[in-house]
A protein has these predicted regions:
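NAD(P)H dinucleotide-binding glycine-rich loop of Rossmann-like/cofactor-binding domains
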Residues: 90-183
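Glycine-rich cofactor phosphate-binding loops and adjacent beta1-alpha1 units
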Residues: 200-208, 217-302
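Mid-domain Rossmann-like dinucleotide-binding core that forms the NAD(H)/NADP(H) cofactor-binding site
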Residues: 141-143, 147-236
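C-terminal hydrophobic helical "lid"/dimerization subdomain
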Residues: 1, 169, 239, 269, ...
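Glycine-rich beta-strand-centered segment in the early N-terminal region that forms part
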Residues: 20-35, 48-109
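Rossmann-fold dehydrogenase core element
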Residues: 280-282, 293-332
Length: 366
């Protein structure tokens, strides 16, 4: 089988590898398509400081495929099932902070303190390889069977589910309820645009899409429908707070901050101050600066500010059900697909993605 491999000098090649039987707890998947992150080139070239697997390894995070074989101790998955793969693997042991990794991408800290624990590094050594290959060997716990009603959907379209999974984790963390008003900071970005579409599908009565790219926000509103309003942020917290409150028709119930690589927290702060008493702010972005929280304002407003690393294991199944029922239209995604041997072109296209764009690598039929 063919697979992309990243070497210790960060060079990458498409090579032939022998197929192997899945180990205990593992599943061999014939890959159909895998999404390409906008920053994947930077990751696999070592420019973002991620804790990459030992080289050589196969990159790639999520994907769509068909089960070919299962290892011992796998009880529910069967050959022939179409599945969605996600990279978040956490040790299934009764410990307060289980080790976790993102397969094919990085080892992660069990908590926000200290470096990468040896147990996380060991977990990554056991499962180093991702989805940019014709076959992927994955732990059964990161696979979700897709409903038969999605069998006719092209795999390149279904990878859009992975784009939606990250903001879904944030909305679950915040406890989004139908009828609530939602602010999305970073709405013109890769995950932020997905958050806007998803919040409408989940029943938000009003969604304010906030960002700096006015044209991208207007394109998003045209697709998302009449419950979505847009705010082009100015960088002035007081002014932006006023605009957000006005667009929401009053103070909002919750805000999802999902801005990538921000060098200021002004927009995040504006979203916080646009919340009602008891409002919730979920932080999933990657700002490189502190967020100032006033003690009195936090106390007087009963605000909840929380972080969210990723999404629960049942999110792919929830999203698949929404897509199968028609509540979530994956057709709004602008998918650009490349065959496996054109990864370099896919990386270039992914780096230019905006809004609802999706870049996928395809491995064969469907």
């Amino acid at each position: 089988m063919r697979a992309w491999r990243v070497n210790s000098d960060f060079s990458r090649f498409l090579v032939e590898l022998p197929e192997r039987a899945p180990p205990p707890g593992g599943v061999l998947v014939r890959m159909q398509a895998a999404p390409v992150l906008s920053y994947l080139r930077e990751v696999i070239e070592g420019r973002l400081g991620y804790s990459l697997p030992s080289a050589p390894f196969t990159p790639g995070t999520n994907g769509i495929g068909v089960v070919e074989a299962v290892g011992a101790g796998v009880y529910h998955l069967r050959p022939g099932q179409r599945v969605i793969l996600d990279p978040h693997l956490a040790v299934d042991e009764r410990t307060p902070e289980p080790a976790q990794i993102l397969i094919g991408l990085t080892a992660t800290r069990s908590s926000g303190f200290g470096g990468i624990a040896e147990v996380a590094a060991a977990l990554q050594r056991d499962w180093p390889d991702g989805t940019l290959a014709e076959r992927a060997c994955m732990p059964a716990s990161v696979l979700t069977s897709l409903p038969a009603s999605l069998d006719g959907e092209p795999a390149a379209r279904l990878v859009g589910l992975s784009k939606l999974a990250v903001p879904y984790g944030g909305f679950l963390r915040a406890g989004l309820q139908a009828g609530e008003t939602v602010l999305v900071n970073g709405a013109s970005g890769y995950f932020g645009s997905a958050a806007v579409i998803l919040s409408v599908a989940l029943g938000a009565s009003r969604v304010v899409a906030a960002g700096r790219d006015r044209a991208a926000l207007e394109r998003l509103r045209a697709v998302a429908g009449p419950r979505v309003a847009t705010v082009t942020l100015s960088g002035d917290r007081s002014r932006d707070t006023e605009w957000l409150v006005d667009a929401a028709g009053g103070r909002a119930d919750l805000a999802l901050d999902i801005v990538g690589h921000a060098n200021t927290a002004t927009a995040t702060s504006a979203c916080l101050y646009a919340l009602r008493r008891g409002g919730r702010l979920v932080m999933m972005g990657s700002a490189n600066v502190p967020l100032e929280l006033g003690f009195y304002d936090m106390l007087a407003n009963d605000w909840h500010v929380m972080g969210c690393f990723t999404y629960p294991a049942d999110v792919p199944a929830r999203l698949a059900a929404l897509a199968a029922s028609g509540q979530l239209d994956l057709g709004v995604m602008n998918v650009r697909a490349f065959p496996l041997d054109r990864l370099e072109d896919a990386l270039e296209a992914a780096a230019r993605m905006r809004g609802l764009d999706v870049t996928a690598v395809t491995m064969g039929a469907r």
